[in-house]
Amino acid sequence: MSICKHGAPFVVQHENRYGSGASQSSLLSKSIHHISNSHEAINFISCYSANGSCFSNAQMLANASGSPVIGYYGKVNKLTASLANSGRIFRPQHKLAANICYVGNRLLSAP
């Protein structure tokens, strides 16, 4: 499954609203579960989705969805995302680590 969203470090656009990767990932996860209950990897085509490592938007989506997520460093589009080895895989974290990283993502997304 692929998801294409506008993104910036620690910020994602969803339904014409910008917010932290942490807050938007829970909304994205709910949308994903309406489509599929599969735990296949999610290809998160969003600029800067891998930036920030454990605080990244891709990690937030992995934690919210319970599925592995492929995120990208820097600017990305559908064409560059299809290149071999262009993304990084993020796996869901344990609850304590996920909560700490959630707070970190929210803090880093603040203006």
Would you name each region that the model predicts?
Residues M1-S53, C101-Y102, L107-A110:
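Catalytic-core segments of thiol-dependent peptidases
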Residues A41-P111:
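Active-site-proximal C-terminal subdomain of hydrolase catalytic domains
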